[in-house]
UniProtKB/Swiss-Prot annotation:
Pfam families: OTCace, OTCace_N
MF terms (GO), sorted A to Z: amino acid binding; aspartate carbamoyltransferase activity
UniProt protein name: Aspartate carbamoyltransferase catalytic subunit
Keywords of the record: Pyrimidine biosynthesis, Transferase
Quaternary structure (record): Heterododecamer (2C3:3R2) of six catalytic PyrB chains organized as two trimers (C3), and six regulatory PyrI chains organized as three dimers (R2).
Family of this protein: Belongs to the aspartate/ornithine carbamoyltransferase superfamily. ATCase family.
Native organism: Hyphomonas neptunium (strain ATCC 15444)
PROSITE patterns listed in its UniProt record: CARBAMOYLTRANSFERASE (PS00097)
The organism's place on the tree of life at top rank: Bacteria
Catalysed transformations (reactions): carbamoyl phosphate + L-aspartate = N-carbamoyl-L-aspartate + phosphate + H(+)
InterPro entries (UniProt xref): Asp/Orn_carbamoyltranf_P-bd (IPR006132), Asp/Orn_carbamoylTrfase (IPR006130), Asp/Orn_carbamoylTrfase_sf (IPR036901), Asp_carbamoyltransf (IPR002082), Asp_carbamoyltransf_Asp/Orn-bd (IPR006131)
EC supergroup of this enzyme: transferase
Protein backbone atom coordinates (compact mmCIF):
# COMPACT_ATOMS: atom_id res chain seq x y z
CA UNK A 1 0.00 0.00 0.00
CA UNK A 2 1.29 3.43 -0.94
CA UNK A 3 1.88 6.02 1.80
CA UNK A 4 -0.99 8.48 2.34
CA UNK A 5 -0.84 11.73 0.40
CA UNK A 6 -1.14 14.62 2.90
CA UNK A 7 -2.02 17.09 0.14
CA UNK A 8 -4.84 15.01 -1.34
CA UNK A 9 -8.54 14.96 -0.42
CA UNK A 10 -11.23 12.81 -2.02
CA UNK A 11 -13.96 15.31 -2.92
CA UNK A 12 -16.47 13.32 -4.98
CA UNK A 13 -20.07 13.06 -3.76
CA UNK A 14 -20.99 10.15 -6.06
CA UNK A 15 -19.30 7.39 -8.04
CA UNK A 16 -21.10 7.46 -11.38
CA UNK A 17 -18.23 6.26 -13.54
CA UNK A 18 -14.49 6.21 -14.09
CA UNK A 19 -14.96 9.19 -16.38
CA UNK A 20 -14.39 12.24 -14.22
CA UNK A 21 -11.95 10.57 -11.84
CA UNK A 22 -8.32 11.65 -11.56
CA UNK A 23 -5.51 9.11 -11.22
CA UNK A 24 -5.09 10.35 -7.64
CA UNK A 25 -8.74 9.46 -6.95
CA UNK A 26 -8.25 5.96 -8.32
CA UNK A 27 -5.01 5.51 -6.41
CA UNK A 28 -6.67 6.65 -3.19
CA UNK A 29 -9.57 4.23 -3.59
CA UNK A 30 -7.20 1.38 -4.40
CA UNK A 31 -5.00 2.15 -1.39
CA UNK A 32 -7.99 2.17 0.97
CA UNK A 33 -9.39 -0.98 -0.63
CA UNK A 34 -6.00 -2.66 -0.28
CA UNK A 35 -6.06 -1.98 3.45
CA UNK A 36 -9.53 -3.51 3.72
CA UNK A 37 -8.40 -6.57 1.75
CA UNK A 38 -5.46 -7.05 4.10
CA UNK A 39 -7.70 -6.80 7.17
CA UNK A 40 -10.05 -9.41 5.77
CA UNK A 41 -7.21 -11.80 4.98
CA UNK A 42 -5.84 -11.31 8.49
CA UNK A 43 -9.25 -12.00 10.03
CA UNK A 44 -9.48 -8.48 11.44
CA UNK A 45 -12.85 -6.76 11.49
CA UNK A 46 -12.76 -3.28 9.93
CA UNK A 47 -13.75 -0.21 11.91
CA UNK A 48 -17.55 0.22 11.78
CA UNK A 49 -17.38 3.55 9.96
CA UNK A 50 -20.94 3.16 8.65
CA UNK A 51 -22.64 2.53 11.99
CA UNK A 52 -26.00 4.30 11.93
CA UNK A 53 -25.91 4.66 8.16
CA UNK A 54 -28.40 3.16 5.71
CA UNK A 55 -27.35 1.80 2.32
CA UNK A 56 -30.02 0.93 -0.25
CA UNK A 57 -29.22 -1.46 -3.11
CA UNK A 58 -31.61 -0.65 -5.96
CA UNK A 59 -31.15 -3.24 -8.70
CA UNK A 60 -33.33 -2.90 -11.80
CA UNK A 61 -31.21 -5.65 -13.38
CA UNK A 62 -30.51 -8.85 -11.50
CA UNK A 63 -26.97 -9.51 -10.33
CA UNK A 64 -26.52 -11.80 -7.36
CA UNK A 65 -22.75 -11.32 -7.47
CA UNK A 66 -22.66 -7.52 -7.42
CA UNK A 67 -25.56 -7.03 -5.04
CA UNK A 68 -24.14 -9.56 -2.57
CA UNK A 69 -20.74 -7.89 -2.77
CA UNK A 70 -22.20 -4.49 -1.90
CA UNK A 71 -24.28 -6.04 0.90
CA UNK A 72 -21.28 -7.74 2.48
CA UNK A 73 -19.16 -4.60 2.14
CA UNK A 74 -21.79 -2.38 3.77
CA UNK A 75 -22.52 -4.82 6.60
CA UNK A 76 -18.83 -5.27 7.38
CA UNK A 77 -18.65 -1.51 7.92
CA UNK A 78 -21.68 -1.55 10.21
CA UNK A 79 -24.36 -0.17 7.88
CA UNK A 80 -28.02 -1.12 7.79
CA UNK A 81 -28.61 -2.54 4.30
CA UNK A 82 -31.84 -2.66 2.32
CA UNK A 83 -31.68 -4.55 -0.98
CA UNK A 84 -34.44 -4.04 -3.54
CA UNK A 85 -34.31 -6.38 -6.53
CA UNK A 86 -36.67 -5.30 -9.28
CA UNK A 87 -39.08 -8.20 -8.72
CA UNK A 88 -39.89 -6.85 -5.26
CA UNK A 89 -40.21 -3.18 -6.15
CA UNK A 90 -43.10 -0.96 -7.18
CA UNK A 91 -41.35 -0.35 -10.50
CA UNK A 92 -43.07 -3.55 -11.61
CA UNK A 93 -46.33 -1.66 -11.11
CA UNK A 94 -45.31 1.14 -13.46
CA UNK A 95 -43.39 3.50 -11.19
CA UNK A 96 -40.64 5.43 -13.00
CA UNK A 97 -37.03 5.73 -11.92
CA UNK A 98 -37.64 9.34 -10.89
CA UNK A 99 -40.68 8.36 -8.81
CA UNK A 100 -38.63 5.66 -7.13
CA UNK A 101 -35.80 8.11 -6.48
CA UNK A 102 -38.09 10.67 -4.89
CA UNK A 103 -39.72 8.02 -2.70
CA UNK A 104 -36.39 6.64 -1.53
CA UNK A 105 -34.97 10.12 -0.99
CA UNK A 106 -37.80 10.89 1.40
CA UNK A 107 -36.59 7.95 3.52
CA UNK A 108 -33.19 9.67 3.97
CA UNK A 109 -30.72 6.91 3.04
CA UNK A 110 -27.01 7.67 3.20
CA UNK A 111 -26.13 5.88 -0.03
CA UNK A 112 -27.98 4.42 -3.00
CA UNK A 113 -26.34 1.70 -5.06
CA UNK A 114 -28.09 1.44 -8.41
CA UNK A 115 -27.97 -0.95 -11.33
CA UNK A 116 -30.15 -0.01 -14.29
CA UNK A 117 -30.52 -1.14 -17.91
CA UNK A 118 -30.48 2.45 -19.19
CA UNK A 119 -27.18 4.21 -19.74
CA UNK A 120 -27.22 7.31 -17.58
CA UNK A 121 -29.63 5.88 -15.02
CA UNK A 122 -27.23 6.46 -12.12
CA UNK A 123 -26.55 10.04 -13.18
CA UNK A 124 -30.27 10.77 -13.42
CA UNK A 125 -30.79 9.34 -9.94
CA UNK A 126 -27.95 11.44 -8.50
CA UNK A 127 -29.76 14.61 -9.60
CA UNK A 128 -32.90 13.65 -7.71
CA UNK A 129 -31.58 12.52 -4.32
CA UNK A 130 -29.64 14.06 -1.45
CA UNK A 131 -27.37 11.10 -0.72
CA UNK A 132 -24.38 9.44 -2.34
CA UNK A 133 -25.14 7.46 -5.51
CA UNK A 134 -22.92 4.57 -6.57
CA UNK A 135 -23.27 3.20 -10.08
CA UNK A 136 -23.33 -0.61 -10.04
CA UNK A 137 -23.77 -0.73 -13.82
CA UNK A 138 -25.89 1.39 -16.17
CA UNK A 139 -26.73 -0.15 -19.51
CA UNK A 140 -23.66 -0.40 -21.72
CA UNK A 141 -22.19 2.76 -20.20
CA UNK A 142 -20.10 2.18 -17.07
CA UNK A 143 -19.43 -0.17 -14.15
CA UNK A 144 -16.87 1.73 -12.06
CA UNK A 145 -16.52 -0.60 -9.07
CA UNK A 146 -15.82 -3.52 -11.41
CA UNK A 147 -13.06 -1.49 -13.06
CA UNK A 148 -11.60 -0.58 -9.68
CA UNK A 149 -11.61 -4.18 -8.45
CA UNK A 150 -9.94 -5.24 -11.70
CA UNK A 151 -7.20 -2.67 -11.15
CA UNK A 152 -6.75 -3.66 -7.51
CA UNK A 153 -6.42 -7.31 -8.51
CA UNK A 154 -3.86 -6.46 -11.18
CA UNK A 155 -1.88 -4.23 -8.83
CA UNK A 156 -1.73 -6.88 -6.12
CA UNK A 157 -0.65 -9.61 -8.57
CA UNK A 158 1.75 -7.57 -10.72
CA UNK A 159 2.81 -4.99 -8.09
CA UNK A 160 2.11 -2.26 -10.63
CA UNK A 161 -0.31 -1.11 -13.31
CA UNK A 162 1.76 1.40 -15.24
CA UNK A 163 3.37 0.01 -18.37
CA UNK A 164 1.48 -3.29 -18.43
CA UNK A 165 0.00 -4.59 -21.68
CA UNK A 166 -3.61 -5.57 -21.02
CA UNK A 167 -5.70 -7.36 -23.65
CA UNK A 168 -9.49 -7.29 -23.24
CA UNK A 169 -11.28 -9.71 -25.57
CA UNK A 170 -14.93 -10.44 -26.23
CA UNK A 171 -18.19 -8.56 -26.47
CA UNK A 172 -16.77 -5.04 -26.31
CA UNK A 173 -19.88 -3.40 -27.78
CA UNK A 174 -22.24 -4.41 -24.99
CA UNK A 175 -19.74 -4.35 -22.12
CA UNK A 176 -19.78 -1.55 -19.58
CA UNK A 177 -16.87 -3.38 -17.95
CA UNK A 178 -14.74 -2.97 -21.08
CA UNK A 179 -15.40 0.76 -21.16
CA UNK A 180 -14.79 1.44 -17.46
CA UNK A 181 -11.80 -0.87 -17.09
CA UNK A 182 -10.14 0.48 -20.24
CA UNK A 183 -10.53 4.06 -19.04
CA UNK A 184 -9.23 3.24 -15.57
CA UNK A 185 -6.24 1.28 -16.86
CA UNK A 186 -5.38 4.07 -19.29
CA UNK A 187 -5.52 6.66 -16.51
CA UNK A 188 -3.11 4.56 -14.46
CA UNK A 189 -0.63 4.14 -17.30
CA UNK A 190 -1.42 0.70 -18.71
CA UNK A 191 -1.53 -0.05 -22.45
CA UNK A 192 -4.94 -1.48 -23.32
CA UNK A 193 -5.75 -3.44 -26.48
CA UNK A 194 -9.32 -4.47 -27.29
CA UNK A 195 -10.22 -7.48 -29.40
CA UNK A 196 -13.35 -9.20 -30.64
CA UNK A 197 -15.51 -9.87 -33.68
CA UNK A 198 -15.91 -6.82 -35.90
CA UNK A 199 -19.62 -6.79 -35.12
CA UNK A 200 -18.86 -6.49 -31.39
CA UNK A 201 -16.33 -3.66 -31.46
CA UNK A 202 -18.02 -0.25 -31.28
CA UNK A 203 -16.62 2.92 -32.84
CA UNK A 204 -14.80 5.40 -30.63
CA UNK A 205 -12.87 3.03 -28.37
CA UNK A 206 -9.86 5.34 -28.71
CA UNK A 207 -11.75 7.86 -26.57
CA UNK A 208 -11.66 5.31 -23.75
CA UNK A 209 -7.88 5.24 -23.98
CA UNK A 210 -7.49 1.97 -25.88
CA UNK A 211 -4.32 1.74 -27.98
CA UNK A 212 -5.97 -0.58 -30.49
CA UNK A 213 -9.20 -2.40 -31.25
CA UNK A 214 -8.98 -5.31 -33.67
CA UNK A 215 -10.09 -8.80 -34.61
CA UNK A 216 -6.81 -10.77 -34.53
CA UNK A 217 -6.74 -12.30 -31.05
CA UNK A 218 -3.59 -14.36 -31.65
CA UNK A 219 -1.65 -11.33 -32.83
CA UNK A 220 -2.63 -9.01 -29.98
CA UNK A 221 -1.90 -11.64 -27.32
CA UNK A 222 1.83 -11.47 -28.01
CA UNK A 223 3.58 -9.83 -25.07
CA UNK A 224 0.41 -9.49 -22.99
CA UNK A 225 0.82 -9.18 -19.22
CA UNK A 226 -2.90 -9.50 -18.52
CA UNK A 227 -5.67 -11.13 -20.56
CA UNK A 228 -9.25 -10.29 -19.63
CA UNK A 229 -12.07 -12.23 -21.25
CA UNK A 230 -15.60 -10.85 -21.48
CA UNK A 231 -18.92 -12.67 -21.52
CA UNK A 232 -21.05 -12.68 -24.64
CA UNK A 233 -24.06 -10.61 -23.54
CA UNK A 234 -26.62 -12.38 -25.66
CA UNK A 235 -29.47 -10.71 -23.76
CA UNK A 236 -28.39 -7.33 -25.16
CA UNK A 237 -28.04 -8.53 -28.76
CA UNK A 238 -30.94 -7.97 -31.13
CA UNK A 239 -29.22 -8.77 -34.44
CA UNK A 240 -27.02 -11.45 -35.93
CA UNK A 241 -23.77 -10.56 -34.21
CA UNK A 242 -22.31 -14.08 -34.31
CA UNK A 243 -22.54 -17.07 -36.65
CA UNK A 244 -22.39 -19.51 -33.71
CA UNK A 245 -20.85 -19.96 -30.27
CA UNK A 246 -18.60 -22.68 -31.66
CA UNK A 247 -17.31 -20.33 -34.33
CA UNK A 248 -16.77 -17.63 -31.71
CA UNK A 249 -14.69 -19.95 -29.53
CA UNK A 250 -12.61 -20.96 -32.54
CA UNK A 251 -11.43 -17.40 -33.10
CA UNK A 252 -11.82 -15.68 -29.74
CA UNK A 253 -11.89 -18.37 -27.05
CA UNK A 254 -8.97 -18.40 -24.60
CA UNK A 255 -7.27 -21.79 -24.74
CA UNK A 256 -3.95 -23.06 -23.39
CA UNK A 257 -2.48 -22.73 -26.87
CA UNK A 258 -3.56 -19.11 -27.14
CA UNK A 259 -2.45 -18.20 -23.64
CA UNK A 260 1.03 -19.46 -24.53
CA UNK A 261 1.27 -16.52 -26.96
CA UNK A 262 1.18 -14.08 -24.04
CA UNK A 263 3.99 -13.61 -21.54
CA UNK A 264 4.87 -16.74 -19.52
CA UNK A 265 3.53 -15.15 -16.34
CA UNK A 266 0.42 -13.65 -17.94
CA UNK A 267 -2.58 -13.19 -15.66
CA UNK A 268 -6.06 -14.30 -16.75
CA UNK A 269 -9.15 -12.37 -15.65
CA UNK A 270 -12.90 -12.48 -16.21
CA UNK A 271 -15.56 -10.23 -14.62
CA UNK A 272 -18.07 -13.09 -14.56
CA UNK A 273 -20.32 -14.82 -15.02
CA UNK A 274 -18.35 -17.06 -17.37
CA UNK A 275 -19.53 -19.03 -20.38
CA UNK A 276 -17.09 -21.92 -20.17
CA UNK A 277 -16.23 -23.29 -23.57
CA UNK A 278 -17.42 -20.10 -25.25
CA UNK A 279 -15.01 -17.33 -24.24
CA UNK A 280 -12.67 -19.39 -22.06
CA UNK A 281 -11.91 -23.08 -21.54
CA UNK A 282 -12.20 -24.51 -18.03
CA UNK A 283 -8.55 -25.52 -17.78
CA UNK A 284 -7.60 -21.85 -18.11
CA UNK A 285 -10.40 -20.46 -15.93
CA UNK A 286 -9.42 -22.83 -13.12
CA UNK A 287 -5.68 -22.85 -13.82
CA UNK A 288 -2.72 -21.20 -12.06
CA UNK A 289 -2.80 -18.11 -14.30
CA UNK A 290 -6.38 -17.30 -13.34
CA UNK A 291 -7.19 -14.67 -10.69
CA UNK A 292 -10.94 -14.80 -11.25
CA UNK A 293 -11.74 -15.70 -7.63
CA UNK A 294 -9.37 -12.98 -6.43
CA UNK A 295 -11.40 -10.50 -8.46
CA UNK A 296 -14.49 -11.47 -6.47
CA UNK A 297 -12.54 -11.08 -3.23
CA UNK A 298 -11.21 -7.66 -4.23
CA UNK A 299 -14.72 -6.61 -5.21
CA UNK A 300 -15.80 -6.57 -1.58
CA UNK A 301 -12.70 -4.60 -0.55
CA UNK A 302 -13.22 -2.00 -3.28
CA UNK A 303 -16.87 -1.57 -2.35
CA UNK A 304 -15.92 -1.18 1.30
CA UNK A 305 -13.56 1.61 0.27
CA UNK A 306 -16.12 3.34 -1.95
CA UNK A 307 -18.87 3.15 0.69
CA UNK A 308 -16.42 4.40 3.33
CA UNK A 309 -15.47 7.42 1.22
CA UNK A 310 -18.97 8.34 0.03
CA UNK A 311 -21.18 7.42 2.99
CA UNK A 312 -18.82 7.30 5.95
CA UNK A 313 -16.94 10.54 5.61
CA UNK A 314 -14.09 11.23 3.22
CA UNK A 315 -10.58 10.35 4.33
Amino acid sequence: MAPPRPDYTFTHEHLLGIEGLHPLDIGHILDLADSYAEKTRAGVRPDPVLTGKTVVNLFFETSTRTMSSFEIAARRLGAHVISMPIANSSVKKGETLIDTAMTLNAMKPDALVIRHSASGGAKLLSRKVDCAVINAGDGTHEHPTQALLDLLTIRRVKNRIEGLKVVICGDIAHSRVARSTTMALHLMGARVHLCGPKTLIPPGTETWGAESAGTDFDKVLKGADVVMMLRLQLERMNGSFLPSRREYFRYFGLTAERLALAKPNATVMHPGPMNRGVEIESTIADGPSSVITQQVEMGVAVREAVLHLLAGGKS
